[in-house]
Amino acid sequence: MTIRLEQPTDYREVENLTRESFWNVYRPGCTEHFVLHHYRTSPDFIPALDLVMEEDGRVMGHVMFSKAELLADGGRRVPSWTFGPISIHPDYKRQGYGLRLLQYALQKARQMGVGFICMEGNIEFYKHAGFGLASKLHIHYHAEPEDAVVPYFLAQELIPGWLHHNGVTEATYCPPRGYFVADQNPEAFEAYEATFPKKEKAFQEGQLPQFCQSCGMPLTRVADCGTNADGSTSFDYCQYCYKDGHFLQDCTMDQMIMHCAQFVSEVNKGLPQPITREEYIGQMKMFFPHLKRWRQEQ
């Protein structure tokens, strides 16, 4: 097993590897391969930390790193870093290769002066590489309330004392825009996806919660979903917002929020403690700007 820098001749193989690794894991289908495809030309991309793992001449693992930012007190922007996607071919998963690749990459990043990393992932895996809840370091996730303990938002000081040395006692992490390229360019993503062999999207146990990217309704089964122009299932939007490739409501984000507010009594049925209509509106005003439909308007 060897680890080396990715070369241009590896690009398509690595993108296919990434697609195979992530398909239906965190959501129906995946977009990580498209993120990688575009990221290599981003100013945030770090070529020296773009690594592949080989076994007998076959590329079976890959990880890339990116520049990022923390928004600290007074709006001060502090450079930081993140990584991902990290991919291991399904044939090699659960054999320790992912951890070996990540530990190698983190050591190389540390040697390059990378001092602090935020990322999103499963703590049960990433704790073995030194990651813990970012909230314990008073680093907040941009899409969650500041007092929330976000179980998938993780961080690590690769260089001890880096936060203190940079005057960071509390900050908010904003993921680089390059990670949202599929949402911002849905037609380009669909055209790119069509260059790969067709695979079926599906809801599976263990995926992250999925929400309608227009109204925020939870999506847990195909029957909840809308339809695309060709009649296929849209895993992005619910049946009440999207049909045959068109939105059923011609409205602004604020109008959608007020429309959804009338259903607060239904929302409260699934909550341990009920919230008021005003509280629900406040939560939606924080959440909706991060939904695909409305993020395109930001």
What residue ranges belong to the model's regions?
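Active-site rim helix/loop that mediates acceptor-substrate recognition in acyltransferases
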Residues: 15, 22-64, 69
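Short cysteine-rich clusters marking metal-coordination/redox-active sites
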Residues: 212-215, 238
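Conserved acetyl-CoA pyrophosphate-binding loop and the N-cap/start of the following alpha-helix
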Residues: 92, 96-104, 114
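C-terminal "cap" of GNAT-fold acetyltransferases
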Residues: 140-190
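Short linker/helix segments within small regulatory modules
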Residues: 225-235
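A short beta-loop-alpha structural element at the N-terminal edge
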Residues: 2-14
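A short, internal acetyl-CoA/4′-phosphopantetheine-binding micro-motif in the GNAT/acyltransferase core
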Residues: 85-93
